[in-house]
Amino acid sequence: MIRRREWLRMATAAVMLCGNTVFSQNDPGKASIGRVSVSVYYATDGDPKVAGAKAAAVTQEIEKCLRGEARLRFKSYRLLGQDVQPLLRSYESWAQPLKPSDEVLVRFEARSAPTPQATGLDLELWLSRKKILKTDARLGGNRPLFILGPEWRGGRLIISVALAPKKNPGS
């Protein structure tokens, strides 16, 4: 009787181990088809130091893009945080640019396979755990999508969503 139980336990363990390898094949929906960069900027006509010591100056390229839009024109801009996440073939991804805070979250999901010219995304912006924006975005080339966010410390938050370059240029 004891040997039968031991044999049954061993057989059950073997089936579980073998079954686990059979069923754990790669899910093609989890394949990374690109990368998305989400940045949060602080824009103000006042003193940019109120953004805090961790806020970094933005590049001239980003500043030029921001000043190119009438509603985004401010005297100074600071980068508050950035997150780069993979764009998965069939699953949603979440970016958390102000880590460890979850005050600003961006959910995105691919609508189509990315091309060098553009990529279609389902995009949601969440502030303070509330969805405030849902849109179909078409991101192209080096042109980010800017979203004018809420007022903050005498200025405004600007959320930027853009395609990020691949980690390995050859892949």
Task: Label every PLM stretch briefly.
Residues 2, 25-171:
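Outer membrane pore-forming secretion/assembly proteins and partners of Gram-negative envelopes
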Residues 3-9:
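N-terminal export leaders
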Residues 11-12, 22:
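Cleavable N-terminal signal peptides
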